[in-house]
């Protein structure tokens, strides 16, 4: 079995960052012993060097290999330079027991919006062209809109073109972060799993800090949402070969009040 932990948006340096949550998640990850940890960005709050160094102190306590893409907060204040020095490459590939994971930087300096860009499409197709039991793509920004996240400026600007590249490349799962709302979409045979914030109280509606765990064995994939200090639920469970979907459980991530219509108010 391959186990991949997906964490996102710790926001070290934010007044809403909770060290106790991050410490607990590190303990849980080390007990779980995943084959790899994928972090989809916003390690920092403002991209400052000291925030990066503080994140590295947490990261270095995680025993599993960890691969990271930058988020929009990490690209602030020329923070992408610190990312390259202290974290590593912004675009990368990783192989884990027949699973190929590809990460790409979708951030733009000092902008909240993001894009992947056509100059990367050829490389993405190339790295996914070799056979793999499971193909995973990771980026920070949303690939598809997520309910309860406000105006749709949170997807990458080139989402349509990128979707075409990923689907035609046979990608099975996309991992994203950004707006702190956990959710899963299915489009054709590809699943898009968004993670919440792992250690921040910048929460939308009634969501809670959480992270995802992906388990893959014998053609079967299970994605579980876990909460620090206990609890969680399976949010997707399916077979790759048949597309058969055993389970998809999504709680309403953001409580939305029903607005009375004019007639109801009369």
What do the PLM-derived regions correspond to, one by one?
Residues 49-130, 161-167, 212-213:
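Extended active-site neighborhood of metal-dependent phosphoesterases/phosphodiesterases
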Residues 12-16, 45-50, 72-79, 109-112, ...:
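Active-site environment of divalent metal-dependent phosphoester hydrolases
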Residues 131-148:
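Short acidic, glycine-rich surface-loop motifs adjacent to enzyme active sites
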Residues 216-266:
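A short C-terminal boundary segment appended to hydrolase-like catalytic domains
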Residues 1-54, 58:
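N-terminal active-site segment of His-dependent metallophosphoesterases
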Residues 151-220:
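Conserved beta-sheet core of the metallophosphoesterase superfamily
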Residues 7-8, 36-42, 66-72, 105, ...:
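Active-site neighborhood of phospho(di)ester-bond hydrolases with catalytic His/Asp-centered motifs
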Residues 1-5, 93-103, 129-136, 186-192:
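Beta-strand-turn-beta hairpins that frame and shape the catalytic cleft
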């Amino acid at each position: 079995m391959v186990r991949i932990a997906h964490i996102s948006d710790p926001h070290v340096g934010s007044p809403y960052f909770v060290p106790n949550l991050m410490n607990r998640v590190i303990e849980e990850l080390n007990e779980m012993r995943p084959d790899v940890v994928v972090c989809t960005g916003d390690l920092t709050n403002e991209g400052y060097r000291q925030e990066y160094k503080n994140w590295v102190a947490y990261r270095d306590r995680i025993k599993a290999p960890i691969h990271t893409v930058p988020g929009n907060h990490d690209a602030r204040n020329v923070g992408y330079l610190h990312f390259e020095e202290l974290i590593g490459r912004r675009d990368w590939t990783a192989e884990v027991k027949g699973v190929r994971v590809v990460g790409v930087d979708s951030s733009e300096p000092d902008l909240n919006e993001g894009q992947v860009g056509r100059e990367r499409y050829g490389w993405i197709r190339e790295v996914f062209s070799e056979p793999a039991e499971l193909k995973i793509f990771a980026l920070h920004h949303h690939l598809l809109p997520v309910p309860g996240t406000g105006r749709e400026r949170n997807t990458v600007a080139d989402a349509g073109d990128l979707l075409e590249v990923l689907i035609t490349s046979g990608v099975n799962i996309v991992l994203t972060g950004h707006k702190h709302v956990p959710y899963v979409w299915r489009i054709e045979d590809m699943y898009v799993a968004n993670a919440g914030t792992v250690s921040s109280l910048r929460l939308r509606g009634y969501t809670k800090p959480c992270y995802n765990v992906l388990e893959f064995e014998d053609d079967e994939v299970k994605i579980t949402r876990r909460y620090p200090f206990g609890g969680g639920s399976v949010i997707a469970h399916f077979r790759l070969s048949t597309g058969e979907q055993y389970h998809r459980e999504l709680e309403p991530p953001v409580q939305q009040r029903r607005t009375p219509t004019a007639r109801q108010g009369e």
